């Protein structure tokens, strides 16, 4: 019993530090709400709640997978994290990954049969893609040749995730052009944040950040390209009036990469704001 309590406490600590439930559940909820209002005027409460729950567990699953993949690097660069410091053993984490995969696949099958084939298929596909990411697409040497290519291959999972959240409330519209553009707003915002959060000029070399591997100009160029994708996609679904000012704000901070690189946290914060606006945009536009 004491061992069970200790294990439960360890997982509580892990979630608090690496996958804070209030944060990731809020992200899932905001995505689900915007997915609802992308095609609907009324609120599908049950669909939104189920979508939020599934997205939350997907976020937890992908974080666990990253913890395992980054274990050796974290032992050197981030020994304070749960896995390197021994709070949870790698075997326990792998077991949790297996349980989550099995549970999400079972939910996907039930959704396919009881909710809509589109939602179930999208969830199963997303879980399958996360497995490919976990295994680095069975060609780790190839996808690790370029850090940006590696990141992009992993960011692509957002497309089926957005298709899933739309399919939960509007299954007939899950595979339409509007849904694709909506998912591309998520991809653009997320990819920009992914690069912006790894601009620390003093990061440990073993972390192989985008800045260390490719330099400042390449990082800025990729961020601008991601923001371009976000901006065009936002225009396609009619939320550019909300998205473009946030994009402009982030662009104003980008010169810090050259002139005040130690202020990289400001760029990260601005990119997080862009991500928040993207998540809220369709919902806010609905009520304007």
Residue ranges, per PLM feature:
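Topogenic membrane-insertion module of multi-pass membrane proteins
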Residues: 1-68, 95, 138-145, 154-157, ...
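Extended hydrophobic alpha-helices typical of membrane-associated regions
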Residues: 4-12, 140-143, 218, 242-288
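Intramembrane alpha-helical segments
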Residues: 7-12, 16, 92-170
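Small-residue-rich segments of transmembrane alpha-helices in multi-pass membrane proteins
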Residues: 27-33, 84-87, 148-167, 211-221, ...
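Hydrophobic core of alpha-helical transmembrane segments in multi-pass integral membrane proteins
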Residues: 28-37, 101-110, 124-131, 158-163, ...
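Helix-coil boundary and interhelical linker segments in multi-pass alpha-helical membrane proteins
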Residues: 34-52, 105-121, 160-184, 232-241, ...
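Transmembrane alpha-helical segments that form the membrane-embedded catalytic/substrate-channel core
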Residues: 56-67, 127-139, 159-164, 182-203, ...
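Solvent-exposed interhelical
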Residues: 63-102, 187-231
